Amino acid sequence: MKNSFLINILIIYYLFIILFVNSQDLKLGGSCELIDSNSPCFSKLNYTNFYLQPGDSITQLNKNVSDIIRMLEFTTPECKPNAINIMCLKSYPKCETYNETLSNNTNIIFNLPSLPCNSICLKAETPCKIFIDNFIKDLSCNSNFSNGAPMFPINSTDYEFKESGNFNFNVECNDNIIYDNSSSVINCPAPLLNSKDHVIPGKTTYYYITDSCILDCPFEIYPGKTKILDRTNYTLTSISFITCIFMILTFGVLPNKITHRMESILSFACGGCITALSLFIQSRQDNFNCSSDPGRFKSQSDYLCLLTGLIFQFGAITSIFWSPMIAYDFYITSTLGKIRKFGLYRIVLWSFIFVLTALPAFGGKYSATVATNCWINSDDGSAWQYVSFYIPSWCAMGLICLFSILSVINVSKMYIQTPNNRILFFNIKILITLLLFLFVLTFASSLKFYMEERMDTYFDAIAVWVECIGKGDPSQCELHAPGYDLKALNIVVIGILGFTVFIGYGLDPIVIHIWMESKKFQWVLKKCRLDKIIKLNNSINNSNNNNNETASTSSGNERKQTTVKMSNLKSTEINQQP
């Protein structure tokens, strides 16, 4: 992460330097000028007059050099002072004046630049080697001007003038620099922080812009829009949390007997509820991703970050792993069969859930990042996210697809044999729920790869922002990172995870039947003295009558209930005969 930030960001800066240097081709016929006190090189040069090329402006020259020197804050303490020396000697070359007499006794003045000595360039070559080799080869110590003259002569430069007469001048190279130790200090422009002052040895999750400058925390990728995303996320997650609580009550607390289908729905809802809980914990604290150390994002050593990371991973994997079981139950029901060895499935699923939650913790991978909350960090390119989340998600997606296709085939055959719109409506509703599962998993697992594919674009946006803050007022610089729409859609997709199961099973008439038949609910009503107001017996009878044709929705995994469904189908077929 550190090196990728460094290389991608410095490309823009050093392309800027290349453009500046290339524009400074050797042009003769210029003038000798005093070095302006506003020049950033005023205190670094041991002479007062410099050679100004024809057509150049002192004001513009000062601005260009100032911008470049500010960009050198993003190098290293070893490279910066030597690079500044080269820039100053090259941008403000010492002016040598020669007064010659022509054959007609006319005096002519030659103003010539004294170019930086090769020895000065060599002092910068080693500490700035990574930058020179990758980005500014034209500025190597062996570079030449377009007319063939060495840019950094070893001893001197020969100038020849034939138009005004046969004049040859040998001008010694210039090494009149005032060495200043203060120039080796890196001053990171706000809001960046100096790594030397803020990075704590032994602690991680710092985001380097260069070897010397790190991002401050918090850092908004989408300035001005983060609060909108947070509010949307909180609202959708709250709705999902409420529906999950309702599903837990309906299929886990109130039933007199919990069937296999109920347990699958209950487990999925518990996962959605736990996932929402991790968001609620983080939303209670402003800038939750930031540690108490300036510039450091929270890592696993911050126990609250570890806790929320574990909770989110456990909840998400729970919902993901139990969604294929819901699809499998739907398939088995469509075959009028029964799930066998459900207890074994239960043990295997929960074992994998606990292992995949704990495994990243043993690897120390739970931490916050610039773009995400506390979860599994893959900034170092490791495979922890793949092993613990994405590969299991892909397996779940494959199983959901398989069982959905098989279920559609079976339901179609069933409807052709015994047309029943109410049963068909229920089956279509479950299929829509499974499609929502697939959409959520597909989008959540593919967004990572889209973001990684666009990573260079993100780095370029950050590079432009850093270049802006390096040149002027940080308040005038705004980061324009791409992908806001996809980020917002991802929040919506993750936020409705728990709500999807409610669409398929929470709106079914069997829910009323479960509540009205529940002995626990009856006990609560009796304790609250509401049993005389709410007539359960009549409600139960009405519910039974309304659900007579859809009795298959209650379990599909019990032999007795399968028999009821078959009887109802036969009864429906008889009633529909003329």
Curated annotation (Swiss-Prot):
UniProt name for this protein: Frizzled and smoothened-like protein Q
Membrane-topology descriptor: Multi-pass membrane protein
Signal peptide residue numbers: 1-23
Membrane topology (Extracellular): 24-233, 283-305, 363-388, 444-490
Location of this chain's protein in the cell: Membrane
Residues that carry a glycan: N46, N64, N99, N104, N144, N155, N181, N233, N289
Biased composition (Low complexity): 544-556
Positions in the Cytoplasmic compartment: 255-261, 327-341, 410-422, 512-578
Gene Ontology CC annotation, any one: membrane
InterPro entries assigned: Frizzled_dom (IPR020067), Frizzled_dom_sf (IPR036790), GPCR_Fz/Smo-like (IPR050949)
PROSITE patterns hit by this protein: FZ
Disulfide bonds: C32-C95, C41-C88, C79-C128, C121-C141
Assigned keywords, A-Z: Disulfide bond, Glycoprotein, Membrane, Receptor, Signal, Transmembrane, Transmembrane helix
Biased composition (Polar residues): 563-578
Domain FZ, first and last residues per copy: 27-157
UniProt region (Disordered), positions on chain: 544-578
Protein family (similarity comment): Belongs to the G-protein coupled receptor Fz/Smo family.
Spans through the membrane: 234-254, 262-282, 306-326, 342-362, 389-409, 423-443, 491-511
